Design a protein with these regions (language model features):
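Canonical Rossmann dinucleotide-binding motif of NAD(H)/NADP(H)-dependent dehydrogenases/reductases
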Residues: 1-11
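Residue(s) in the substrate-gating loop at a strand-loop-helix junction
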Residues: 118
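Short C-terminal tail/terminal secondary-structure segment
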Residues: 123, 189, 202-203, 214-228
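Alpha-helical segment proximal to the catalytic Tyr-Lys
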Residues: 102, 147-151, 211
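Short, small/polar-rich loop/turn modules that mediate ligand/substrate recognition or access, typified
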Residues: 151-156, 213-215
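Active-site helix of classical SDR
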Residues: 97, 134
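Substrate-binding pocket helix/loop in short-chain dehydrogenase/reductase
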Residues: 73-74, 78-86, 179, 183
Length: 228
């Protein structure tokens, strides 16, 4: 929504109901395209870029926000749960970056890629080992792609690391009042973030204001990492 408020037309990829998001974006006077598929499907990145360019004529910004987790202790995780998380959070994310970068190169003029990492990009967690592994890797490959694409193609690849956020994914944690209270003591701002808190960082990284920022991860965490 924040990018639409800043003037961007939006392409949303996923299988969940997006009617509320679509209404908000159209109310802002921006165009909206929904592509009903999972980013982890084979050939999805190429198809997503193709449909985007067919509709809007070009691609300027990629935000990799898809993510899943499995809440299992490390001693109990099985290969399927491990691989399911890595397929969406890391493998699909990289190939979306690759497909977008190829389109940026074809267009000329560069482009902006924003990957969504996590505070677990910096530290371990509990019961989320494949998620932690994937998000640490996202931070690392963000730097790697910057190294290869910055000067040669003028492609900016940066990352946002959210802290504790009120989302569907964190609902199990938030259902435990004692866990919520304990977590708030570890956040200097003493509250969980909401998705709207990420808008400023996303707009900055998508805009010309960040033209000399590349390969970096911005924490939007209420100060959590500062206190850790």
């Amino acid at each position: 929504i924040g990018l639409a408020e800043a003037g961007a037309d939006i392409v949303c990829v996923g299988r969940s109901d997006d009617s509320e998001t679509q209404e908000k974006i159209k109310a802002l006077g921006r165009e909206y395209l929904n592509i009903r598929m999972s980013v982890s499907e084979e050939n999805a990145p190429e198809e997503i870029v193709k449909q985007t360019v067919e509709r809007f004529g070009k691609l300027d910004i990629l935000v990799n926000a898809a993510g899943i987790t499995r809440r299992v202790m490390a001693i109990d995780i099985d290969r399927k749960d491990w691989q399911d998380v890595l397929d969406v959070n890391l493998t699909a994310l990289f190939f979306m970056c690759q497909a977008a970068a190829r389109q940026f190169i074809k267009q000329g003029g560069g482009g902006k890629i924003i990957n969504i990492g996590s505070m677990t990009s910096y530290q371990g967690g509990i019961k989320v080992i494949p998620y932690t592994a994937s998000k640490a890797a996202v931070r690392n490959i963000t730097m790697h792609m910057c190294n290869e694409w910055a000067a040669k193609y003028n492609i900016h690849v940066n990352c946002i690391a959210p802290g504790y956020m009120v989302t569907n994914m964190t609902a199990p944690m938030r259902s435990e009042p004692s866990r919520m209270a304990e977590t708030n003591t570890r956040i200097p701002m003493e509250r969980w973030g909401v998705p709207e808190d990420l808008a400023g960082a996303a707009i900055f990284l998508a805009s010309d204001a960040s033209d000399y920022v590349n390969g970096f991860t911005i924490a939007v965490d209420g100060g959590f990492l500062a206190k850790s």
